[in-house]
């Protein structure tokens, strides 16, 4: 039997997870390359700033470890209060992420869940 679990923050609001799953265009991302290491460090700096947004609790960035053409490259996982999502959407960090890296993204999946 599958259980539906709702996680509440300390204040009682229902928390959600916001996933950004990204596949970069060809020749943009090579996991072990120096350019990709620098790019990842910059992406981490951008998303670290989102932790300053009230209601954003955690941000984790995961790299794909299976270099196959049908795989995505990064998954950014944010845990936040549902009310924080529109604040994040309007934040300078989110706008910087889109401005700096949007042109390099081949496909992106956004998935929100409780």
Residue ranges and their predicted role:
Residues 2-72, 83-86, 114:
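Short S/T/G/P-rich N-terminal loop/turn motif that feeds into the first structured element of a domain
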